[in-house]
């Protein structure tokens, strides 16, 4: 969650963080790199551990981490919860801490200082009940898209378009490159999905329209990624969390323009895209005058089975029963 990260982390604070703690983090990240961990995974560990060390800076007198005990890490867990982070988010931050201290325990240099991984003694939070899926109608999606265009937020309009066109996961859409979209093709560069599966994402008219607007606005730069942010006047690749924050901010558009409250997230667009293609309400389906079959959607979503694809759609059992008895 980039909003939480950006609220806690600043370069000024980071400059003040204990050098021992910084060195431990960098050595741990180098170890992850040597294990061939993905760049995105390593970046996530870095962000998670920066939150930890800024907490230590502000709440624990910037002590070197080897001087902390179990109660300190328990208090850290409580502090994270006070920031209204989800159980999954808190558990991930604690997991990053445990992994780093586990590395330190076994390391020749740090093992003398850190003989016991006290963080391992702090229990994780109980997993929260799965959230309800919030489906979006094509009309609601177009309201979001048109509002972003009107605000000249063309990059976010492109994200909205690509999510609904491709039914891609956030991690897949994040991998799309700047030069991978053109009128001559309908597929992006190759991305890596769940379980290491490689494929290209499909896009259509909405993506092409938003892409042209965005690239004209963005101009020339040497960043390969499709997604960028500007920090202190400097362009850089947007973080993975930025895409999440942008999508969450669109909830306000539906509230302001349609008086609709929906707690949707990036994955809602994957569900909604498949549902709209299945019912024929997606603009692509209307253009083709067809409803996509479950088998076609399985291929579209890069699922292993139609059972998985079916689970992404709205359950229509009640409608089928009413229709069977002539009550619909």
PLM regions with names:
Residues 8-11, 25-43, 47-131:
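N-terminal core-binding DNA-recognition domain of tyrosine recombinases/integrases
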Residues 138-170:
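Basic, Lys/Arg- and aromatic-enriched nucleic-acid-binding interface segment
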Residues 204-261:
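Active-site/catalytic core of tyrosine-dependent DNA strand-transfer enzymes
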Residues 245-299:
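Short, basic (Lys/Arg/His-rich) helix/loop patches that form interaction surfaces
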């Amino acid at each position: 969650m980039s909003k939480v990260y950006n609220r806690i982390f600043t370069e000024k604070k980071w400059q003040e963080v204990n050098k021992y703690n910084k060195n431990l983090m960098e050595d741990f990240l180098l170890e992850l790199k040597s294990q061939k961990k993905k760049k995105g995974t390593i970046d996530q560990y870095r962000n998670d551990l920066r939150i930890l060390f800024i907490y230590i800076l502000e709440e624990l007198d910037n002590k070197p981490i080897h001087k902390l005990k179990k109660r300190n890490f328990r208090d850290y867990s409580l502090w994270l919860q006070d920031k209204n982070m989800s159980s999954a988010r808190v558990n991930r931050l604690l997991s990053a801490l445990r992994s780093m201290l586990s590395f330190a325990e076994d390391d020749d240099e740090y093992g003398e200082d850190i003989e016991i991984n006290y963080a391992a003694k702090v229990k994780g939070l109980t997993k929260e009940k799965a959230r309800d899926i919030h489906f979006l109608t094509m009309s609601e999606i177009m309201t979001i898209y048109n509002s972003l265009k009107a605000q000249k937020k063309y990059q976010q309009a492109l994200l909205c378009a690509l999510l609904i066109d491709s039914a891609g996961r956030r991690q897949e859409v994040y991998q799309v490159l700047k030069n991978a979209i053109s009128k001559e093709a309908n597929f992006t560069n190759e991305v890596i999905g769940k379980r290491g599966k490689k494929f290209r994402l499909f896009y259509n008219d909405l993506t092409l329209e938003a892409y042209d607007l965005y690239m004209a606005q963005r101009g020339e730069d040497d960043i390969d990624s499709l997604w960028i942010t500007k920090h202190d006047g400097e362009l850089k690749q947007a973080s993975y969390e930025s895409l999440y924050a942008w999508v969450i901010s669109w909830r306000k558009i539906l509230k302001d323009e349609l008086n609709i409250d929906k707690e949707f997230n990036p994955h809602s667009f994957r569900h909604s895209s498949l549902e709209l293609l299945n019912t024929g309400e997606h603009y692509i389906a209307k253009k083709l005058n067809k409803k996509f079959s479950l088998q076609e959607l399985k291929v579209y979503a890069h699922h292993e089975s139609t059972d998985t694809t079916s689970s992404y759609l709205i359950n229509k059992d009640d409608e089928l029963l009413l229709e069977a008895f002539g009550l619909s």
